Amino acid sequence: MKLTRRYRFSAAHRLDSPRLTAEENRTLYGKCNNPYGHGHDYVLDVTVDGSPDESGQIVAREPLDELVRERVLQRFDHRNLNADIAELAGVVPTTENLTVVIGKALADGWTMPARLDRVRVSETERNIFEMEL
C-alpha cells in the first residue's frame, strides 16, 4: 500500500550554463534564462510504501511531515536555488536536478519502517518530475 503526502514551497532560480554562450543559454532555457531569475510555486509529493502497522497506518504522519519540513521546506522555501542551496552549486538548477537533491536529502534522513518510494516535484501544471528511490 502507498501513501502520498503533498507539500508546497516557493523558490527562485535562473537556468544558465557557464558552458554555453549567452545566445545558446537563451535558446535552450528561454524565459527561464532571465538574468534576474524567476520563481515557481513548487508542489512536492512524497510517496511511502509499506503495510499498515498495529496503529492501522503505513507511517505516522507527523514524523513524515517533520522530516520533510527539516530536510526540504526549511531549506528550500523562499530561497534562490542558484545562491542558497549548496548541492546545486556548480550545476544548472533545473527541476530535474532539484528533484535529485530533494530525493537524496529525504533518503539520507529516512529512518521510518515504511519504504521511501518516490518524490515528485511539480514545477508547473505541465512540468512534473518524478524520481523513484
Predicted segments with their positions:
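Charge-rich, low-complexity N-terminal segments
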Residues: 1-133
